[in-house]
């Protein structure tokens, strides 16, 4: 997701743009959370647990535990999150979305095929190398090449573990997931907003309007929108026996521009040339070459004059840069009048109410979430935050019947 190879480029060319500081710098400030990104992150972590435990005691809703702990950790440090949910996307993203969907389907089919080969091979005598299924040989060759191992030393257990790891990449966000998360956020009395467009675009809009202080995401699109990007939270990292400190790491947008010696418009053109979710990059021109061209030519139009016009694969037409510029410069403001609770967002950061422990207990039981709520409650009490015992959501949660559908979220409007 995001700008193709941008973070890799930054780490190699401008590592100093990554800033790590004490998390208390965000205390009493509003932070927009790019919720879809965190859903993918936490669902992937939950899938990893399934792999580690061989599927034993696996709970497909276990990813909600991560959101509970995340919210608790933010509140512990007096950080005020606003979870931004997805609302739509521009039509230029259709190609990317379809490609990602096909990739997930291909991964799933390949994984099932490999598992069938593993099952078949496991029941055979496995006496001769020629008995090894071809697809398992190919997987082993990939492993051997990556780890500098002899190709002839086929290791069945290593291949089995490698195939098992593939389940971590079969991650889908469904309507059911969104409904469960909304229930959790209500019970935790944590604000969330349904964006009228893509979540990261609305986050960028709030940042530029100075309604929020920062954006938590791993989506490098945030940089193309011209915003600082909080890429990591580290909670209670132990430094020594007596000292614990929590940190944040973010990419400083202004420092990045200064270090790369680019204006904001030039940086956006650089991002477009790298390739985005809305356009492909020019054939055989990656991030490094794109930077070199923009650094000298200053804009995509001038780059077009520099390239060979007879090379159909090497023209700027594939970039669709006028439309993509418009998306990054104006798309975040589209349908903004449809957003509810804007007055709430503009208020000074404060917790309007505290989590409802009774309903949270009900939720963890209903969705079979394994979490030590007493430990969480004790943490809130240490922060002088008391649990609410009554809530307007109680009746709704008790009667909740989330539709058990695994349909992916693909019904968002296209703008």
UniProtKB/Swiss-Prot annotation:
Enzyme class: hydrolase
Domain of life the protein comes from: Viruses
Molecular function in Gene Ontology: 5'-3' exonuclease activity; 5'-flap endonuclease activity; metal ion binding
Record has Kinase as a keyword: no
Gene3D superfamilies: 5' to 3' exonuclease, C-terminal subdomain (1.10.150.20), 5'-nuclease (3.40.50.1010)
Span list, region I-domain: 163-297
Residue segments, region N-domain: 1-114
The family this protein is said to belong to: Belongs to the XPG/RAD2 endonuclease family.
PANTHER family: FLAP ENDONUCLEASE 1 (PTHR11081:SF9), FLAP ENDONUCLEASE FAMILY MEMBER (PTHR11081)
Protein name: Probable RAD2-like endonuclease 369L
Organism this protein belongs to: Invertebrate iridescent virus 6 (IIV-6)
